[in-house]
Curated annotation (Swiss-Prot):
The keyword S-adenosyl-L-methionine does not apply. It comes from the Bacteria. HAMAP family: Ribosomal_uL22_B. The keyword Secreted does not apply. One of its GO terms (cellular component) is cytosolic large ribosomal subunit. This is Large ribosomal subunit protein uL22. Part of the 50S ribosomal subunit. One of its GO terms (molecular function) is structural constituent of ribosome.
Amino acid sequence: MSRAIIKFIRLSPTKARLIADEVQGMNAELALASLSFMPNRGAKYIASAISSAVANGGFEPEEVVVKSCRVDAGPVLKRFRPRARGSASRIRKPTSHILVEVSKPESKEA
């Protein structure tokens, strides 16, 4: 089993989790192929994490399975936008941490 972590990505964890749930349990090669056709910005980061985890273990993409793909919330950057009458509203810029684990599929013995 090998893993890769990408930290402090300027992407909302809620949006990234939608993509992470799609690839969990998939073959790594199939997951990378399906992520390349997704229009979401988070798909690029998750594909990068999967290919990095495969390379960290010295595997080929077709021989491993995405065991887990977890997206955790990172720190939130807070900015202010000036509003009417001298007030201000808060702009939240969330960040994410992506953790991907890949491993060889467990053989099913009858």
